[in-house]
Amino acid sequence: MAKLIYSYLFISMFVLSVLLALPNAEGADIKRCVVDVKLSKPCTFQECIPLCFQRYNGNGVCTGKKNEICTCAYNC
């Protein structure tokens, strides 16, 4: 009986040490930034997406009441 308890204890400690030794997830500390670019004419996806990709290496979406704002989201 004592051998069985020690075996379970050893296995539990081994599993716990393996779980604690696992590295943190990659990219867990990446932050997202958002920038609004005001355009002089109504926003189109053909204009907004390349603009955000060139300036910020991110994604773009047309927002605003009359789609006059291009909102860019990118990794800070």
From Swiss-Prot:
Keywords on record: Antimicrobial, Disulfide bond, Fungicide, Plant defense, Secreted, Signal
Subcellular localization, as worded in the UniProt entry: Secreted
Cellular compartments per GO CC: extracellular region
Signal peptide: 1-27
InterPro entries registered for this protein in UniProt: DEFL (IPR010851)
One GO BP annotation of this record: killing of cells of another organism
Domain of life: Eukaryota
Disulfide bonds: C33-C76, C43-C62, C48-C70, C52-C72
Pfam families noted in UniProt: SLR1-BP
Family: Belongs to the DEFL family.
Protein name: Defensin-like protein 163
Gene: LCR24
